[in-house]
Curated annotation (Swiss-Prot):
Residues 112-163 form the bHLH domain. Residues 91-103, 226-241, 248-257 have a biased composition (Polar residues). PANTHER family: BASIC HELIX-LOOP-HELIX ZIP TRANSCRIPTION FACTOR (PTHR15741), TRANSCRIPTION FACTOR AP-4 (PTHR15741:SF27). One of its GO terms (molecular function) is RNA polymerase II cis-regulatory region sequence-specific DNA binding. This is Helix-loop-helix protein 11. Transmembrane segments: none annotated. It is found in: Nucleus. Residues 274-291 have a biased composition (Low complexity). Keywords: DNA-binding, Nucleus, Transcription, Transcription regulation. One of its GO terms (biological process) is regulation of transcription by RNA polymerase II.
Length: 431
């Protein structure tokens, strides 16, 4: 009877040991490692089993076995050694061990299993989330966009297929990658068009700058004319040159004329220059014995670009110098004149100048001799334009002038220029 009870207890212990082995195998499969397990000392179990039936009863045997299990030393063994008696017998009895799971209640054992399972699941989800984060970093990201795990997997698959397609296009069947063709012609055409556009803008700005500079120059000259307008009332004394003519000061000549008619500063008009400027000064020969020979007749030719310039008859005084006053674009002389006049007329060719000299010589001869005989002109002067010298010192001079006019009209015919001044000019006689 006692031995049967001991056999039942041994079966209970062995069953508990196998139960622990299955639990430990489950923990090892989940990656938790060795689990500390407490097993009763094998010697105490053997002594309890080999006790004689006459000494101890069933109750005393159970108490002995329980007391032997409680008082025996505990040891921590790996799960692989559970259920192996020889290894348990050779363990050191000096190492203490915690309570065995067999001594715990079922609720605590189930709670421990749940904690182990939760830890394993947590580690598994962390590894999965880390993989999805890595895939999300490779995908193109938009601001504020949130993707689920399924969307991340779908976009990753699409990107992989797209990259595989590009790889097939870039690498032909031979395995050598294609060389990228640079669109040099297209870029060159764009650059040429841009250069042409910039050149057009530069030319436009340059033309505008030149126009503005010319306007600034004209405004400066106009300002200079207004500042020198106070000098218009002051008399201007022409300077006598070596050839018997008179010239105006260069400063007055440059400021008295209007701005469009003024020449460049490098070359200013002078009255004695007959080749470079339209203003020419011609001297008429007079009688060497007359008192008017000191102020002989001189003809000024203004530039042809002055249609509104007035024709002025100037009578110089016997005593030089002659004072000329100019107050506007038209020329005038306030000083009294009594000798042969100085006539401003339009510019004529050189042969016409010879005709003027011939006519002036005839007038001077008529003035000195007192007759009014017509003067015959050379035949080589026919067909050219001519002008006349108007003098009013006496009636004889007027008759001689009429004779010269009739002779010129007879020689030139229809080419004769009327004696009256043009409509744009005015003749003013200053006495």
């Amino acid at each position: 009877m006692v031995r049967s009870d001991s056999a039942e207890e041994d079966q209970i212990i062995i069953d508990d040991g196998f139960d622990l082995t299955e639990e430990d195998e489950e923990m090892m499969s989940s990656g938790t490692g060795a689990l500390p397990v407490t097993i009763a000392d094998w010697n105490s179990v053997t002594n309890a089993r080999m006790a004689p039936p006459s000494i101890m009863s069933a109750a005393s045997a159970f108490d002995l076995t329980a007391s032997g299990m409680q008082n025996s030393l505990r040891s921590v063994l790996p799960t692989s050694t559970i259920g192996h008696a020889p290894m348990l017998a050779n363990r050191s009895l000096s190492q203490p061990a915690p309570l065995s799971p067999t001594s715990l209640d079922p609720d605590r054992r189930s709670r421990m299993r749940r904690q182990i399972a939760n830890c394993n699941e947590r580690r598994r989800m962390q590894s999965i989330n880390a993989g999805f984060l890595a895939l999300r970093a490779l995908l193109p990201r938009k601001e504020g966009e949130k993707l689920s795990k399924a969307a991340i997997l779908q976009q990753t698959a699409d990107m992989v297929h797209q990259l595989l397609g590009h790889k097939g296009e870039d690498i032909p069947d031979g395995g050598e990658p294609k060389k990228l063709k640079l669109e040099e012609d297209h870029h060159d055409a764009d650059h040429q068009a841009q250069i042409a556009h910039l050149q057009t803008i530069l030319e436009t700005e340059r033309a505008a700058r030149k126009a503005l500079e010319s306007q600034v120059i004209q405004l400066r000259e106009l300002l200079q004319m207004t500042t020198t307008s106070s000098q218009a009332s002051s008399p201007v004394t022409p300077r006598s040159n070596g050839s018997g003519g008179f010239t105006l000061p260069s400063s007055y000549a440059s400021s008295a004329l209007p701005t469009p008619l003024r020449e460049s500063p490098e070359r200013k008009p002078s009255f004695q220059d007959t080749t470079s400027t339209p203003l020419s000064l011609l001297t008429l020969n007079g009688s060497p014995t007359s008192s008017e020979s000191l102020a002989s007749q001189r003809i000024f030719h203004p530039p042809p670009t002055l249609p509104s310039l007035e024709t002025t008859v100037i009578r110089p005084t016997p005593l030089p110098p002659i004072s000329v006053e100019i107050s506007s674009p038209s020329l005038s002389t306030p000083s009294p004149l009594t000798a042969a006049p100085i006539i401003f007329s339009t510019a004529v060719p050189t042969q016409s100048s010879i005709l003027f000299q011939t006519a002036a010589a005839a007038v001077t001869s008529a003035m000195s001799t007192g007759n009014s005989t017509p003067v015959a002109l050379p035949h080589h002067l026919q067909g050219h334009n001519s002008a006349f010298v108007s003098t009013q010192p006496s009636l004889t001079l007027s008759q001689s002038m009429q004779t010269i006019v009739e002779a010129i009209r007879h020689l030139e015919g229809s080419h004769f220029i009327p004696t009256s001044p043009p409509p744009t000019s005015q003749t003013s006689l200053v006495r």
